[in-house]
């Protein structure tokens, strides 16, 4: 069966749900599809279908990142339902990196929890430009306490340099929307939320004119067709027939893109912001891996040595409890993967304490496609302990 062609009529925006486990992120995602389905802007996706990977069911928590698409009168959205559990922060980092904006879900009955804070911090680190808040479970909350919860959320957002006073906070109940009970807390609140998302989350400026680059998230081999790599196009445009380089981790290789698809529909081209699959000519599944990038030939080079300006989380933010010294060996999380690196502190700096800002030199054990301004997280065994940006490339 031929694939339906994806028509691009409305501006496209990538958003997602973030927040503490069990505050209702997946229920809200389902509720949005249900309410927008009434106007033909979505196909209803039940909670179970969004929470679908087998290991998730067993634990009742969302591990994988689910992709849902829907549209409002103004925009087409690709929505990722991010993992909510602390154990899965690694997945959140890859999920949150795919967002032009996010809906922070906070249970009005419980208020901000440790992962609420962690996700706001992560959103700040991975550069999510704008957040909108949905105070969920209003059907179960004590009305007198809701105002306090709202103030608490605004303070927390301001603390992590989001404009806490200006961010829209919509109160409602995903459950009411799903069960068609209380319309004010259910359907109407969801419509209000989507209005806020439409107007408050800025239309992302797509760096379409820059040279093509797509971080590799996943690699599949499709029998009879070849190797498909998937990811979100970071910048530029990719057309069928374009030459690309596979850069990072190993020697750079040239190949040709023989097909581009999005949401399982064929495209003439993929552009910045699109989540696509690219079919590569003559490339074996084992030639490409997560952590590499596809890029316009000559536009980006792999490097192991750079100086980075970093912020090390303090203990209260879930960071280290002790200082580190020269020769510290954490993992550096670039785009989609962790690479171990050795840190050298600047002259005259004996040690770095949790909560410090410092410029460090790093030598990675494998080369990563990088240019100045590339952001990264510093992690130890899956826990984020710092964040930084490449200040200059030294080798």
From Swiss-Prot:
Q: What is its EC number?
A: 3.6.5.3
Q: Where is this region: G4?
A: 136-139
Assembly and interaction partners: Monomer.
**Gene transcribed to yield this protein:** tuf
Recorded catalytic activity of this chain's protein? GTP + H2O = GDP + phosphate + H(+)
Annotated segments matching region G1: 19-26
Stated name of the protein? Elongation factor Tu
* PROSITE patterns hit by this protein: G_TR_1 (PS00301), G_TR_2 (PS51722)
> What organism is listed for this UniProt entry?
Acidiphilium cryptum (strain JF-5)
Q: Which CDD domains match?
A: EF_Tu, EFTU_II, EFTU_III
Which residues lie within the region annotated G2? 60-64
Q: Which UniProt keywords apply?
A: Cytoplasm, Elongation factor, GTP-binding, Hydrolase, Magnesium, Metal-binding, Nucleotide-binding, Protein biosynthesis
GO cellular-component terms in the record? cytosol
InterPro entries per record: EF-Tu_GTP-bd, EF-Tu_GTPase, EFTu-like_2, EFTU_2, G_TR_CS, P-loop_NTPase, Small_GTP-bd, T_Tr_GTP-bd_dom
């Amino acid at each position: 069966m031929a694939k339906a062609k994806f028509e691009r009529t409305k501006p496209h925006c990538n958003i997602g749900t973030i927040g503490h486990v069990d505050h209702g992120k997946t229920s809200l995602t389902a509720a949005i599809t249900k309410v927008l389905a009434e106007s033909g802007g979505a196909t209803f996706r039940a909670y179970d279908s969004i929470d679908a990977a087998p290991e998730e069911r067993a634990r009742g928590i969302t591990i994988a990142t689910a992709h849902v698409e829907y549209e409002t009168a103004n925009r087409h959205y690709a929505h990722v339902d991010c993992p909510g559990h602390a154990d899965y922060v690694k997945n959140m980092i890859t999920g949150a990196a795919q967002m032009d904006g996010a809906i922070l879900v906070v249970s009005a009955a419980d208020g901000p929890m440790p992962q609420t804070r962690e996700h706001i911090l992560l959103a700040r680190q991975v550069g999510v430009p704008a957040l909108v808040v949905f105070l969920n479970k209003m059907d179960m909350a004590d009305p007198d306490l809701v105002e306090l919860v709202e103030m608490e959320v605004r303070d927390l957002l301001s603390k992590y340099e989001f404009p806490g006073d200006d961010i829209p906070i919509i109160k409602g109940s995903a459950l009411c929307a799903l069960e068609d009970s209380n319309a004010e807390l259910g359907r109407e609140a969801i419509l209000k939320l989507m209005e806020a998302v439409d107007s408050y989350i800025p239309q992302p400026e797509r760096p379409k004119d820059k040279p093509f680059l797509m971080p590799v998230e996943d690699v599949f081999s499709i029998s009879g067709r070849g190797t498909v790599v998937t990811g979100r196009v970071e910048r530029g445009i990719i057309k069928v027939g374009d030459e690309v380089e596979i850069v990072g981790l190993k020697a750079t290789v040239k190949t040709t893109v023989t097909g581009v698809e999005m949401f399982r529909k064929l495209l003439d081209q993929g552009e910045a912001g699109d989540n696509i699959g690219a079919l590569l000519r003559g490339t074996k599944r084992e030639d490409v891996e997560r952590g590499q990038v596809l890029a316009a030939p000559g536009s980006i080079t792999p490097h192991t040595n750079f100086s980075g300006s970093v912020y090390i989380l303090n203990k209260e933010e879930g960071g280290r409890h002790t200082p580190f010294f020269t020769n510290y060996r954490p993992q550096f999380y670039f785009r989609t993967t962790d690479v171990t690196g050795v840190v050298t502190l600047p002259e005259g700096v004996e040690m770095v304490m949790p909560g410090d800002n410092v410029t460090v030199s790093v030598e990675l054990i494998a080369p990563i496609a990088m240019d100045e301004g590339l952001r990264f997280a510093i992690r130890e065994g899956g826990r984020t302990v710092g964040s930084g940006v490449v200040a200059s490339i030294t080798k």
